[in-house]
Swiss-Prot record:
Subcellular location: Endoplasmic reticulum membrane; Golgi apparatus membrane
Protein name: Reticulon-3-A
Tissues and organs where the protein is expressed, per its UniProt entry: Expressed in the animal hemisphere at the four-cell stage. During gastrulation, expression becomes restricted to the prospective neuroectoderm. At the early tail bud stage, expressed in the head structure. At the tadpole stage, expressed in head and neural tissues including the otic vesicle and optic nerve.
Domain Reticulon: 26-214
UniProt-listed InterPro entries: Reticulon, RTN1-4
Keyword annotations of the record: Endoplasmic reticulum, ER-Golgi transport, Golgi apparatus, Membrane, Transmembrane, Transmembrane helix, Transport
PANTHER family cross-referenced by the UniProt entry: RETICULON-3, RETICULON-LIKE PROTEIN
Transmembrane portions of the chain: 46-66, 155-175
Keyword Transmembrane attached: yes
UniProt region (Disordered), positions on chain: 1-21
GO cellular component terms listed in the entry, alphabetical order: endoplasmic reticulum; endoplasmic reticulum membrane; Golgi apparatus; Golgi membrane; neuron projection; postsynaptic density
Subunit relationships: Homodimer.
Protein function: May be involved in membrane trafficking in the early secretory pathway.
Length: 214
């Protein structure tokens, strides 16, 4: 038993360390710790979404591939002409990248699949609880949210919502970091009001429909 516990514990610890590292990287990206990196991701995402709003996805992908090929082919021809003029033999300009190992190992794939599967199973379980009314209040919240989304969908399309989502994702963390105390205060007030209303609703429900005590 002692021999098998070692590899398992090291596998779990390495997986948790990897998840923490990726979480910190995303946090740094959203909080603009590296302005250049965050700006590139934000700008690239916005350009892609705005392109999808104006053109079809097939056109956007085609233009992206053509742009990339234009850059790489032009650079390849330029280096070849330069080597011919200077009579040098530096080889293929992209040789270091071509020789770089970009294969996905089975271990990395298995770790990513395991982590994703845990989130998927949790989401499926929660969705089943909502649709089968395990908690009436939570199911009513979902119904209210979907009813509001029908009005949102009548005004905005999916791409517009994604653009707004990206804008909020890259601006809300900075605003929260700057006005954390004030925002936490108002969020606490709203949470207290929602909790009070929820408790009143649950108190008026029949016993079989009340939220199960854990």
């Amino acid at each position: 038993m002692a021999e098998t516990s070692g590899p398992q514990s090291s596998h779990i610890s390495s997986s948790s360390v990897g998840e923490k590292g990726s979480g910190c990287a995303v946090r740094d990206l959203l909080y603009w710790r590296d302005v250049k990196q965050s700006g590139m991701v934000f700008g690239g995402t916005m350009v892609l979404l705005l392109s999808l709003a104006a053109f079809s996805i097939i056109s956007v992908i085609s233009y992206l591939v053509l742009s990339l090929l234009t850059v790489t082919i032009s650079y390849r021809v330029y280096k070849s002409v330069l080597q011919a003029v200077q009579k040098t033999d530096e080889g293929h300009p992209f040789k270091p990248l071509l020789e770089k190992d970009i294969t996905l190992s089975s271990d990395s794939f298995q770790k990513a699949l395991t982590a994703s599967l845990a989130h998927v199973n949790h989401a499926l379980k929660y969705i089943v609880r909502l649709f089968l009314v395990d908690d009436l209040v939570d199911s009513l919240k979902l119904a209210l949210l979907m009813w509001l989304m029908t009005y949102v969908g009548a005004v905005f399309n999916g791409i517009t919502l994604l653009i707004l989502g990206v804008l909020l994702t890259f601006t809300a963390p900075i605003v929260y970091e700057k006005y954390k105390v004030q925002i936490d205060h108002y969020v606490s007030l709203v949470h207290s009001q929602v909790k009070s209303i929820t408790e009143k609703i649950q108190a008026k429900l029949p016993g079989a429909l009340k939220k199960k005590s854990e």
